Amino acid sequence: MAIGLVGKKCGMTRVFTETGASIPVTVVEVDANRITQIKTNDTDGYQAIQITTGERRDSRVTAAQKGHFAKAGVKAGRGVWEFRVTEEELEGREAGSEIAADLFEAGQLVDVTGQSKGKGFQGGVKRHNFSMQDATHGNSVSHRVLGSTGQNQSPGKVFKGKKMPGQMGNKRVTVQGLEVVSVDAEKGLLVIKGAIPGANGGDVIVRPSIKA
């Protein structure tokens, strides 16, 4: 694992290359990620950096959270996240310090994790890309129905995991191997090629690509 950043999805736009090619990009706003705790093998059984970002009203922060943030000397954020790290990555990091957008550079590949948009209860055609049945030729009221879900007396059941209608979206999704087009450290912006999960304004986690 490696140190990443927590940011907010701003939306999509496009940028142009020197040759005039249009590239679809997503803009991620990265406020300072404040380190709230350094976890080590000796004290916690694993190595990680815990961070927070953004702000939260004082009335929304519990007494335990206030003590945790005060111990690190940072403002209360809208949540806490952890990144598993190696000993080398822990060097120079301490509670109270900050990690900014310049952690990444243009051309670097990243993995982006977010909460996908919820679509509610959907049928097999929309949820799993099933084919529709005949529109005519004797078919009635079954145009978007799944059809058979199994065999016969043997095995006499529907196997677990069978694709069926149900809740679609609102799940943790990671898109791998996206390219960082540009980084604006002053404004705290990451411009990433392609689409990333979630709605505008949602929290996203940006990490160095695990497959790079």
UniProtKB/Swiss-Prot annotation:
Q: Where is this region: Disordered?
A: 147-166
What is an example of a GO molecular function annotated in this UniProt entry?
structural constituent of ribosome
Report the PTM annotation.
Methylated by PrmB.
Q: Which residues carry this modification: N5-methylglutamine?
A: Q153
Name the SUPFAM superfamilies on file.
Translation proteins
Q: Which domain of life is it from?
A: Bacteria
Q: Which UniProt keywords apply?
A: Methylation, Ribonucleoprotein, Ribosomal protein, RNA-binding, rRNA-binding
Q: Name one GO biological process term.
A: translation
Subunit structure comment from the entry: Part of the 50S ribosomal subunit. Forms a cluster with proteins L14 and L19.
Q: Name the protein family.
A: Belongs to the universal ribosomal protein uL3 family.
Function, as annotated, reads: One of the primary rRNA binding proteins, it binds directly near the 3'-end of the 23S rRNA, where it nucleates assembly of the 50S subunit.
Mind telling me what this protein is named? Large ribosomal subunit protein uL3
Q: Which organism is it from?
A: Psychrobacter sp. (strain PRwf-1)
Gene (name only): rplC
